[in-house]
Amino acid sequence: MNPVQNTHRAVAALGAEASSTRLRAMLLGRHPDPSVVTALVQRCAVEPDFFVRDMLTWALTRLPEAVTLPKLRAELTSEQAQARSQALHSLSKINNRSVYPSIVGTLLRDPDDEVARAAWRAAVALAPEGEQRALAAELVTQLGRGDRDVRLSLSRALVGLGAAARPALAAGVNSPDPRTREHAHATLLLLRDPEADYAELVEEARRLVAGRLDPMGREKEPPC
């Protein structure tokens, strides 16, 4: 069977009921064909299986950027949350920094947690040299947001910016919101030791916020 026939079969397989059949999308990456980009992007928006989505992203990275980037940029304003998050994921894998202005801003504050998390990761990966401090200032506005997984994602994104994140996190430590202060402390601790257990860092941050630790992380002496 020639590559054109393989491509047609792979595109048709994207709508199959069985995820194992939909995984044939990998054929679209083996024989890159710009004509299939619309089908791939559309499927990303609705595909329920993580592994199939990952294969769709891989196939997109194999296509010409002149074709994929406009399609993925358009998905960033989709009403479907999965369309936005998958477009962000694919853009981060394509790794073309020209899309950075399309990511920073409202997507970093997207009401959908999965979209916001994808935006944080993509922004850190694609931030041009010299933009890290400004990005950190944007990211710290989300401190205290969501559950443990969401907070860990934001902490990791800020840690990915390295020392450029310290000034913004220092401001977060002085926030009037205790959740923001706790999250900022935990992130600074993670920045100091990226391999540390995050749950332990959060507990230490809580003690800092509660005033039971001094700035060096030592237990305060109880008052006489």
Regions found by a protein language model. Name each.
Residues 1-4, 12, 19-32, 42-43, ...:
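Structural detector for internal amphipathic alpha-helices that build alpha-solenoid repeat scaffolds
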Residues 9-17, 39-48, 71-79, 102-110, ...:
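Alpha-solenoid HEAT/Armadillo-like helical repeat scaffolds in large eukaryotic proteins
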Residues 113:
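Short, acidic/turn-prone active-site loops that include or flank metal/cofactor-
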Residues 133-184:
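Ankyrin-repeat and related helical/solenoid repeat scaffolds used for protein-protein interactions
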Residues 170-224:
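Eukaryotic acidic, Ser/Thr-rich intrinsically disordered low-complexity regions
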